[in-house]
Design a protein with these regions (language model features):
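C-terminal regulatory domains involved in ligand/effector binding and gene-expression control
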Residues: 1-79
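Short flexible coil/turn linkers enriched for glycine and charged/polar residues
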Residues: 24, 53, 93-95, 135-137
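Short glycine-/aliphatic-rich beta-strand segments at the starts of folded cytosolic domains
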Residues: 133-147
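Short, flexible, solvent-exposed loop/turn segments with mixed acidic/basic and small polar residues
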Residues: 16-21, 129-134, 153
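Helix N-cap motif at beta-to-alpha junctions
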Residues: 35-36, 146-150
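Active-site beta-strand/loop microenvironment that shapes enzyme catalytic pockets
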Residues: 81-129
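Terminal interaction module
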Residues: 6-9, 148-152
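Hydrophobic side chains in well-ordered alpha-helices
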Residues: 39-42, 119, 153
Length: 153
């Protein structure tokens, strides 16, 4: 028997959600991605869009068994941005999702705990606002039989 899940949770569509925490603006952009190339393309797209931001951090989880995961703090103190974003995706059991959180610094330092909370909450709230959907794995099976044998089915 296969160990692959028969269904999984992901986001319903690409979208964004914004939080303001102690004058810092956090914009979380989420996209459904199935390959590293798709994830990197989305990260680059958001980073270009918000090129003037203080940070564009990211995390992604790809594959139904989290086969490929990656996180980046993009200049924030180590472990305060990308990993909390990744953990938020994993706690919500989301698969094939890339999160990019853009931060515009608001002149008040948040400290390590504040950053961890802000980045994690950005992803969680974005997913809740954008919408989580359940994907059910299906396989289409086609077969043909002679009309004279239709009663045998």
């Amino acid at each position: 028997m296969s160990s692959k899940p028969l269904n999984y949770l992901t986001i319903g569509k690409t979208g964004q959600h914004e939080l303001i925490i102690k004058k810092s603006k956090f914009i979380c952009s989420l996209a459904r991605t199935e390959t590293v190339e798709e994830a990197q393309e989305f990260i680059e797209q958001i980073s270009k869009k918000y090129h003037d931001a203080t940070h564009n951090t990211y995390a992604y989880t790809l594959g139904l068994n989290d086969n490929q995961v990656k996180a980046s703090d993009n200049g924030e103190p180590s472990g305060t941005a990308g990993i909390p974003e990744l953990k938020a995706l994993q706690l919500m059991k989301l698969k094939n999702v890339t999160a990019v959180v853009t931060r515009y610094f608001g002149s008040i330092k948040l400290g390590a705990g504040g950053l961890i909370s802000a980045y994690s909450n950005s992803v969680t709230e974005a997913a809740q606002n954008i919408g989580v959907v359940k994907c059910v794995m299906q396989q289409l099976i086609k077969f043909s039989i002679p009309y004279t044998r239709i009663d045998e089915i």
